Amino acid sequence: MFRTRFKKEILTEFLPPLRAGKKQKLIILCDGMPSIPRKQPLAEFLAAKGFWVIYPRYRGAWESDGEFLAKSPHEDILDVLDELPGEVEEIAFGKRYRISPNEIFVIGGSFGGAAAILLSLDPRIKRVIANCPVTDWGLLDRAEKAETLKENYAEYIREAFGNAYRLSDANWQKLRTGVFYNPWRHRKEVNPAKVLMFHAKDDPYVPYEGSRRFEEATGVKLKSLRRGGHISTDYITRKYWGQIKKFFDSGRT
């Protein structure tokens, strides 16, 4: 994969499609948190299917500059989109690529599922896949306790992940407001035709009930899985690629 930076801050891996088509189709991958960036095999899978793929790191996470959650993570992705169409220069050898997407899709899981849903509000985005997404940060206390015994979750992240996440207590607490980076707050704005969710009923970290409630409130489609736990986005995308591709195609104009 190639590497570039958008807005001089946001480190992004990218791949061109294995075979170029008449139209440029772009998929943006949105990571969970905390996680280790490891969606490169998924990016290769999608590039082999004919898609451009970009895999950004949120500001303040991993190789990107800035402070994590200083602004809503989905806005980091919008900042990337604001530089497209355009030429991107890969860092290692300076080769330039022209990315001019005719269609843009998003695939995000867990924490990144919230980004996917919020990105669906942007008219440039045709369709999004949200796997085991956080739909409402009212689950935060429960989710924190499932991951650590420490009372201060941001402190746990700093200790366990070091500088991988430059996360302050104040920025983490913004999630508790119900306003910041919260799909539930925007449920009345969601176009149900643009969102497809996957969620396992036995997910121990992000409760299935949140996706079911979001489905009822918005009319988005939810693919419910009996088992699987906090299932990986790589697995979901590969296993259900036929359904996902059909869903993407339904958004063509």
Stretches with model-predicted labels:
Residues 1-22:
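N-terminal cap/lid segment of alpha/beta-hydrolase-fold proteins
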Residues 23-32:
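Short beta-strand element of the alpha/beta-hydrolase
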Residues 47-65:
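Conserved alpha/beta-hydrolase
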Residues 68-98:
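Alpha/beta-hydrolase active-site loop
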Residues 118, 122-168:
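Hydrolase active-site cap/lid region
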Residues 190-191, 196-199, 203:
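Short beta-strand/loop motif that positions the catalytic acidic residue
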Residues 204-210:
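Conserved alpha/beta-hydrolase "acid-adjacent" motif
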Residues 228-241:
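Catalytic histidine-centered segment of alpha/beta-hydrolase-like enzymes
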